Amino acid sequence: MSADPARAESGHTPMMQQYLRIKAEHPDTLVLYRMGDFYELFFDDARKAHRLLDITLTSRGQSAGEPVVMAGVPVHALENYLGKLVKLGESVAIAEQVGDVATAKGPVERKVVRVVTPGTVTDTELLSERVDTLLLAVTRQRASYGLAWLGLSSGTLGLSECGERELAGWLARLGPAEVLVDDRDDAALTAALSTTRTALTRRPAWQFDTALGRRKLCEQLRVASLAGFNAEDVSAAHAAAAALLSYAEHTQGRALAHVGSLAVERASDLLELPPATHRNLELTQTLRGEDAPTLLSLLDVCRTGMGSRALRHWLTHPARVRTAARARHEAIGALMERGGEVLREALRGVSDVERITARIALRQVRPRELTGLRATLLALPALRDGVPRDSALLADLAQQLSPPPEIADLLQRAIADEPAVLLRDGGVIATGHDAALDELRGIAQNCEAFLLDLEARERNRTGIANLRVQFNRVHGFYIEVTQGQVDKVPADYQRRQTLKNAERYITPELKAFEDKALSAQERALAREKLLYDGVLDALQPQLAALGAVARALASLDALAALAERAAVLNWCCPEFVSQPCIEIEQGRHPVVEARLAETGGGSFIPNDCRLDANRRMLVITGPNMGGKSTFMRQVALVVLLAAMGSYVPAAACRLGPVDAIHTRIGAADDLANAQSTFMLEMTEAAAIVHGATEHSLVLMDEIGRGTSTFDGLALAGAIASQLHDRNRAFTLFATHYFELTAFPEKHPRALNVHVSAAESHTGHGDDIVFLHEIQPGPASRSYGVQVARLAGMPAPLLRQARATLEALEAQQAASASQIDLFAAPPPSPPREATELERALAGVEPDTLTPREALDALYRLKSLHERSKEN
């Protein structure tokens, strides 16, 4: 049986009727239905949870004549199971008991208090500390795609628009945890999403409404116009924002009070980084999908999670305009000069103010998060004083570390020094903050002292020496008197229980105390919740101030991390110039260099790279394993690091304007999308020749190797010509086709270089030593047989390969002529004129009368019709 809302409710028990009504409101979501100490799932939800979580599936009783299939998870273990479901891409609605069990007639009232989805997770245990969890909405309007994204745990809100070609690049750049799309078919969007592993949620198309989105954005940002955010002209993004904000508010069950700023990111403002570039340069993930070793893992020595998230954003969103990068370079230099390590040490104890602020707004913050916030706010003055003021950026960030003092004051007064982990455990509100709470706590905590005092007073009053005042859970508080002393009992004693050897009584004073004591703990917890809510209420107006502090701390942490990396790894400050050039002196691959240092693999060999207006392409040849790909990647990484505002691994660096980094490296089949090695190679190459400009950096590694030799050689030559002559992009073109070393002879802006190697002749055969140096001119040979020997190929196989190679080389040398790949195409043979062309050639317009001209026109028309039939 499924949880079908259309099923007649009258056939079900009252509780199942309630459940089915809730399930009908969340048909595509797993519903966790609170029942006492468990969250239960029913019917198809239970079967699915059993499969995903490996929890027990059972059935209990009947409803509508069928067994009720169910599975449950304990309340105390909710976060664990919730995390597993969200990681599997599931969305979960949590239905809590909101009614009073004591007064309920029928099932206690329940309602969904929040919906947890992969893109709207805010629970600390379910979030990655160093990655922002983004919810993205995408919709198409004519030729443009509108994008709107939200980091619910950080309060970030962004908009953009792009064309079909850039869509996959935006998905790679943002890395969303969940994508909202409308329920219309869109082949391009489906294709772009197929390259990701993100959770996909379809929403009705009417929710993606431009006017609604504009209105919701204005309401969210509390403005009358979006002009102040430069967001008036992105109507497709407004439509995406309508669905995004509605969905986020629905999942949280409340307004998003902490979202108060908006960033509009335009593709023309950012350095273009297509998905292949993210993948091939291993920016945030290795080619195997691991988090390290990557460029980000090398850079990220941040002290806080929010610093790590800021650093990741800088890396994946580098700007074409260099203003922000220059400011960061200046700040890094100042921190390297003085104060950087002191600042990093001060940041060590800073809490995640960004996420705590979001959880305050969503009223999900835990007591110990507030104590962490309090400690951070109290440490800000000393931290602020330690920030160097030698750069404008650092001075501005330091100035933002001055939140209103009443925030820390409130937290000091209201929250205990060491509160319980959860509010429900009590002991959260500080003693002295509320007199009523202190009294209730006093009753509960001083119960034993009161009983001893009452016992002493009653013994003295009655003269009964063995009188005892006690408590048990069945009868509550009582005064116990043995049967032999009953005649001394005062008149105000009321009999509560008769035992064989004693009588138990209660007095008005003890009854009054009992009423207070038995309910004191419950009332104290209720009072604490009320006071805690009051603290959160008081913090709501301070969310913007806390957000500013969080952003400043995150930026300082990221800058201090980059300064530490620059100092430890011996990086230099790049110079930006207006002339077209990429000039790198003694450049290194940062990740490879670090790995060599870690593993004791020797020193990295640095290399120069010079590209300018008259030198736009390097044709790179040399042996496999010689370092061609490493050299190409290191040039791209130096350019990217400079653009994000980092120092770079080089002795010196001058960079002109760069608008994109395109890469075609690697030969792995894309089996998931039914693309062979060669098809993937050509698809990526096509995207590059269509998208690269004279300001782009292009890496082409071994293009054409996925097909036959002649096909591959012809295509490689044509692609090189296109990039050199038409795109005019800065290009590093590595190839195993030695015929392409003739390319620079007819292309003046191209130059041959090679990675060097040396041979040594031993009794075991020719050995090869890779020197990893980039030197002028083409390589003399590829050393493929020597590399095969290093790989462990059998000696007989190597002898056969060497003999075949020598024969082929001799055959090539004896060839009388070679194909010129770069000559103009040969002229086509002359073609015999058609009857229509001959008739047209015989017409003399200047000698025709009007009548003759009309006849000629009809004759030509007739010949044309006949030619189509043939």
UniProtKB/Swiss-Prot annotation:
Domain of life: Bacteria
Keyword Nucleotide-binding in annotation: yes
Gene3D superfamilies assigned to the protein according to its UniProt record, in alphabetical order: 1.10.1420.10, 6.10.140.430, DNA repair protein MutS, domain I, MutS, connector domain, P-loop containing nucleotide triphosphate hydrolases
MF terms (GO), sorted A to Z: ATP binding; ATP-dependent DNA damage sensor activity; damaged DNA binding; mismatched DNA binding
Pfam families given in the database record: MutS_I, MutS_II, MutS_III, MutS_IV, MutS_V
GO cellular component: cytosol
Claim: GTP-binding is one of the keywords in the record: no
GO BP terms, alphabetized: mismatch repair
Keyword list, A-Z: ATP-binding, DNA damage, DNA repair, DNA-binding, Nucleotide-binding
Positions bound to ATP: 622-629
UniProt function note: This protein is involved in the repair of mismatches in DNA. It is possible that it carries out the mismatch recognition step. This protein has a weak ATPase activity.
PANTHER family per record: DNA MISMATCH REPAIR PROTEIN MSH1, MITOCHONDRIAL (PTHR11361:SF34), DNA MISMATCH REPAIR PROTEIN MUTS FAMILY MEMBER (PTHR11361)
Family classification: Belongs to the DNA mismatch repair MutS family.
Protein name, as recorded: DNA mismatch repair protein MutS
